[in-house]
Amino acid sequence: MLLRFTKMHGLGNDFMVIDLVTQHAHIQPKHAKQWGDRHTGIGFDQLLIVEPPSRPDVDFRYRIFNADGSEVEQCGNGARCFARFVLDKRLTVKKRIRVETRSGVIELDVRPDGQVCVDMGPPRLEPREIPFQAENAALDYQVEVDGCEVELAALSMGNPHAVLRVENVESAPVHELGPKLEHHPRFPQRVNVGFLQVVDRQHARLRVWERGAGETQACGTGACAAAVAAIRQGWMDSPVLVDLPGGRLSIAWAGPDQSVMMTGPAVRVYEGQVRL
């Protein structure tokens, strides 16, 4: 059978989006891996699946697969594209949408200027909720990599993140240290790794090594995690402008137990069909 799909991106973080509300198919990890190949498939960082809700208090269910076929809990840039997609496809007329993910419910607000604001919920800081192997929650942790101690913050934005402060993101060891931390045994579900440069109290630069995808042009949950880590450390004040290789996100966080608010663009690239 042929499935309709839409190619989208949020700051260069690119997605294949499939509507399983009006189409019916059983998509498996092998399909994500096949379609995600940039040489022989469609090519993407993540595959986003739009499904009917499984509970009455939400509008849709949102599933995410990395290009390596692994299913993950959350994707911030994908959430913005999800909101734009369901409106463009007239799957809803609501401008504020409640969406069920593997890690909980998020709220998406499509603004008149086309920007999408995502209520990502509060960050999770307890090690068992990240998950991260540590006895107690702390502002930062020491993790041993190749015999050296690496200082990082660890938290969850619905998916696990490590955040390292660097002097300059251009020279940060993203491709050397990123995969080593991604697969570090203290992160039992692997981890996304952010390399954060603080420019001033409300402006940062960030590169992210995403688990299952490698370095991407942008990572929404990574920007949220970096902003939360920087605010908790006292390095920055909310709201924070985060510049990623693909563009800029605005992140606001009022403090403990408060939701992280992420605002940025979502762009449709093209429509297509793929054989299942």
Curated annotation (Swiss-Prot):
- Return the broad EC class: isomerase
**Pathway field:** Amino-acid biosynthesis; L-lysine biosynthesis via DAP pathway; DL-2,6-diaminopimelate from LL-2,6-diaminopimelate: step 1/1
Gene Ontology molecular function terms on file: diaminopimelate epimerase activity
Site feature location: Could be important to modulate the pK values of the two catalytic cysteine residues: H161, E210
Principal cellular location given in the protein's record: cytoplasm
Which residues does the entry assign to the active site, renumbered to this chain?
C75, C219
Cellular component, GO, one term: cytosol
Keyword Signal (UniProt): no
Positions annotated to bind substrate: N13, Q46, N66, G76, N77, N159, N192, E210, R211, G220, T221
Q: Which UniProt keywords apply?
A: Amino-acid biosynthesis, Cytoplasm, Isomerase, Lysine biosynthesis
Which SUPFAM superfamilies does its entry note?
Diaminopimelate epimerase-like (SSF54506)
What's the EC number here? 5.1.1.7
Q: Check the record and name the Pfam families matching this protein.
A: DAP_epimerase
- Reactions that this protein is recorded to catalyse: (2S,6S)-2,6-diaminopimelate = meso-2,6-diaminopimelate
Residues of the site described as Important for dimerization: Y270
Q: Does the keyword Amino-acid biosynthesis apply?
A: yes
GO terms for biological process, alphabetical: lysine biosynthetic process via diaminopimelate
Q: Where in the cell is it found?
A: Cytoplasm
Q: Which domain of life is it from?
A: Bacteria
Instruction: Output the PANTHER family linked to this UniProt entry.
Output: DIAMINOPIMELATE EPIMERASE, DIAMINOPIMELATE EPIMERASE, CHLOROPLASTIC
Q: Quaternary state and partners of this protein?
A: Homodimer.
The Swiss-Prot or TrEMBL record describes its family as follows: Belongs to the diaminopimelate epimerase family.
Checking HAMAP family in the record gives: DAP_epimerase (MF_00197)
| Task performed by this protein | Catalyzes the stereoinversion of LL-2,6-diaminopimelate (L,L-DAP) to meso-diaminopimelate (meso-DAP), a precursor of L-lysine and an essential component of the bacterial peptidoglycan.
Q: What is this protein called?
A: Diaminopimelate epimerase
